[in-house]
Every structure is written in C-alpha cells, then in structure tokens.
Amino acid sequence: MYESPIILGSKPCTLNIPGMGVLHGLTVLDENGKEKCHRFTGIRYAKPPVGKLRWRRPVTLEDGYDYSGDYNQFKTICPQPFYNNRKNQVRNPDFKYDEDCLFLNIWVPAGEKPAEGWPVLYFIHGGWLQVGNPLHYRQCDPQDLQADGSPAKFILVSPGHRLNLFGFLAGKELLEEDPKSSNFGFWDQRLGLEWTYKHIESFGGNKENIAVGGISAGSYSALFQLIYETYHPEANQIIKRALLLSNGLSVQPKSVEESQIQFNELAQKFGIPLELSSAEKLEKLRAIPFQDLADNILNLRLHTFRAVTDGDFVNPNTFKDIYDGTFGKRIRDSGRELIIGEVNNEHSIYANTNPPKSKEDLFNQVNNYYPEKVTKALLELYPKVPDMEDEKEYLAAIKALFGSIVSDMQVYASTRVLINGLVKGGVPLEKIYRYRIAFRGKFFDKYEPPESLVPHAGDLGLWFYNVVDGILPEEIPIYKAWLKSYGEWMSTGKTDWGTTKTEEYRLLDADGTIKVVDDEKWDWGLKVGRTVAGVFGLN
C-alpha cells in the first residue's frame, strides 16, 4: 500500500517567485512525453521543531526567507513506529525519517490555469496521528488526476506534520513551561494551511477557493481545522469546504490531566524520575535522540498519542457542539459544504491495528484511543464474546469485536453523529454530500485480496485516479463518472449528488454503478453516538 510513485518520465521545471526565490521542481510526463503535472516537494513552511523547539508550537520562518533550491525529491518524514497491519507489509526504503519534518508537497496541473486560478485541496494524510507521510506513496500520487482528460483538476497541497509523541505528547510539565504547549501536530497543520493561503497564488492557485480534506486521521484533522476556523472568527477564514474521507469525531478528546499517565509512563521508560521538576524532566526528554523515542513507542502500555482537550485548539465543548447542533449552526451560517463518507469494509484495518492480545487486553487497547469512562460504556454496549474452548478462535472473536468498536467510533458512528448534528443545526441537505464506496479497481488485488472488499483507505485510488498504478481501460469510465461530480464540487461547492434525505447516501457500488440508497447503519451509528453522549451527560 505504500510503494513509491511510478514516474514514467520527467523533466526539470523552474518557478521564479519574486520575494521568495527560484524553486526547481519536477514536471511529470506520460509515456509519450506529454506534461501531466508539476511537482514541488519538500518546501519548508516552519522552522525545524528540534532541540528546544521539540514540543513547542511551530515557529514561522523569518520574513524574507529564501526558498531558492531543489524541490524534486521528497524530504524527511516525522519519526514513527511501524504498524504491520496489512499482509506482507514492509517499510518503504525510500522513506527517510527525521524530527525535521515540517515540509509541504505541492502538485500543480500542467496546462493553462483557469482565469481565477486552480482550486486548491489541502489534503492531510492518515495514520491515526501516529504514522504516515504527506503523500510520498503511489496510491495518493495525483499525476493522472491533474493530467489532460481528468474531470477533477486542482492543485494538491499536503503537509508533513508532527505525529505520535512528537506531535501529541501532553502533560502538566509542558503547560507549566508554556500554557500553549499541546496539540503540536494540529498547529503544524494550521501553519501549513496559512502558508498555503499566503503563497499558493504563486503556484497558480486561487487562495479564495481552498478546501481542506484528508483520509482517516487526516479527515479527523481536517474536521478539527474546520472547527478551529469556525470558532475563531479572528483567524483567516481560509477553508471553503471540507472533504472528510472515513473519519469524524466520536468522543471528546482526553483532557491533559487524563494524558498525564501517558507522559509519566514515557518518562519512566527512559529512567527519568517523576520527582524531578517539570523543567528537568523536559530537559532530559529533549536530550533523547528522536529515533530512541520512536523505537520505544510500541513498548508503552499507552502507545497511542492523540489530540487532547486543551481549551485552545480543542475546546472542551467540541463533541457536545457537534452532537447537539451548535457546530452545525456555525457551518450553516458560514455557508460551507462537506463531503462525508466511508468504504464498505472499514472494520478490517482497525481490527488489525494494535489488536488486543487477550480478553483482559481489550479494555487497554480501546482505552488507548478513548477516555476510560467511554471505554467502559462501549464495552457494555457491544455484545460480549462468549467463552470458547478453542483459544485461537476466542482471540479472533475478541479481535473482531475490537475492530467493530473502533471502526464504528472512527468512521461509521462518528460520521453519522456529525451528519445528524449538521442537520440539527440547519445545514441544508444540498450542502452535505454523503457517500459510500463499494467498488474497487482490479489493480487493488495486488495490495489486498478481493475478499477484503474495500478496506479502510482502499478508496484512495479512486479519489486520486491512479491510472498509472494499473486502472484498466474498461474501468476508466467508472472512475471518471465519480470524479466528475467531485471535480465540480471542488471548483464550485455544488454538484448534482442525487440524495434527498438525511438517511441516504450516494453509493459507488461493486459493479461500478452509481445509485442513491438508504443508510442501513444510520440507527446503529446514532445509538453508538448516544451511548458516548450519555457518558458526558448530553442526552
């Protein structure tokens, strides 16, 4: 799933931007030497978050920063653990890791830009906020999406940002040093978005037509970026619409106080006494080489570092406001549009990522993602696994239960709670574009067996139109039919989607047909949402 892009041909390209410098990128060519897109990879948008800047908000580059240089190779990625959650998955040797990871990658369609400039998609990668990279891999390479004949041409920008403990470590020690020291990865994304707004016109983009989107944790991040703007009218209102692929917000993130246990565990893992002062603990943690930190993440009991409720980027009423329609009212008043949806087998990847190793471990693994009281409520809601004589069969059932809980919380329930809240808030249905993907191109068989249907993130080849990866000629009309509406939405925020009720979505069925169908998971998704809301006294 994470192979390097296929480049059939290329040539240098140069962009001379007054006040910024001369940027040397790469023009991607097709097999006949025709230009498909221009690629500029590894553009720095913030100072390196290293040394004393580890676990600090990103720092903007100084005025007059000279961007002159070569941008024809991908730069370094945030250090991260290796999740072996897909069959025969191996690390890509082309990926290079370093704490210095705050770079943007930009792809620009070849050919003459529209009079108003290209629409822009600021796309945040997935990976649980623990792993991933800003589209260094084949499945998200937009060269065919941007080539002649594509019905959805726009500029694509993807930010590298801090992940796992580098991006989401939280604790009182950090707040004592600086009350704004939390959710560093979200602030990275925001600064990259601000950079895009400021500079994208130099690449041919329309800064007044920027969508934010993402897959999985990138969708989660995109939602938080949208929430941040709607709750901070003093900030630049950059985002015109949001593309939320397979993720939403199902629960209020843990408080900093709840995350203190995780901070303490990390300190103890490296022999740092908890009785030291906050400054001393941070000094010792900052002295640890980044690779040592990354290599020990999966050795922690609490190994997943997620967003925290800090009262700043993540306000304490986020889930409540989504649930009761308050956020929906803000979206209604702003006039923004959203695409929200899923694939037909979200379950499989979640069942195989950090799966429980025993019945007792089930609570711990769910608690890695959600607050303790929510974990208890979820385990009471779902049918319990009965005792079995065959231990292997029993563990498989525990793993399946884990996958069901997490796929509901991350996708199936969270998106339905969001949609319901938008409707409660008065967002008109013509601004909510629901979808479900059941179609998979034949090329995907080399990544996942056909029986896995369309697994989580298995639709990336659709959204990025990976012709070069093996889309068959007879499948191209299916892809183009879907992308036509997507391209219209990216350009104008409007398209003929076909849905007329909240409980309907647009389905790209397994046979390649597009139809509008009733949502069979609607009631269950809202029931899961009510269970979580009940924990917080919201029902």
UniProtKB/Swiss-Prot annotation:
UniProt keyword terms in alphabetical order: Cytoplasm, Hydrolase, Nucleus
Domain of life: Eukaryota
Catalytic residues as annotated in Swiss-Prot or TrEMBL: 216 (acyl-ester intermediate)
A GO CC term attached to the entry: nucleus
Matching InterPro entries: AB_hydrolase_fold, CarbesteraseB, Carboxylesterase_B_AS, Carboxylesterase_B_CS
EC number(s) per entry: 3.1.-.-
Classification via Pfam families: COesterase (PF00135)
Annotated family: Belongs to the type-B carboxylesterase/lipase family.
Listed name of the protein: Uncharacterized esterase/lipase C417.12
Source organism per UniProt: Schizosaccharomyces pombe (strain 972 / ATCC 24843) (Fission yeast)
